[in-house]
């Protein structure tokens, strides 16, 4: 299963879906997050408060989830580029994927693994959702 930043933030910020997402992650055989998604999550968490915010919790979460931080391959970079052209904010498509979303999309597409995410953006693409 691939983690999108939105799912990570929902868990670490104690949002309503966070508990359910934790259950889904704990039952997954394999959990991965794109290196771009990992950085995006750290930036979002740091920007939510002065100082380090919740980003120190990110590494604890990654460890708990047994998530591997996946490097971006050239194939994934090309998939992300196509995803932005088709589903990105500038494309006019209702999914309106951002930069980080495109790398979550690419990792999910490249591996064939479902994506765990919060919101409606990815449900408007051709990806298989984890829930």
Model-predicted regions and their roles:
Residues 1-33, 46-60:
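Short, well-structured N-terminal submotif of metal-dependent ribonuclease cores
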Residues 8-9, 38, 122-123:
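A generic structural signal for short hydrophobic patches within well-formed alpha-helices
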Residues 25, 63, 109:
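Anion (oxyanion) recognition and catalysis
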Residues 29-32, 65-70:
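Short loop->beta-strand "edge-of-pocket" segments that line small-molecule binding or catalytic clefts
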Residues 68-114:
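Active-site neighborhoods of divalent-metal-dependent phosphate/nucleic-acid chemistry enzymes
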Residues 105-131:
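Acidic, PIN/NYN-like endoribonuclease modules and their adjacent C-terminal/linker elements
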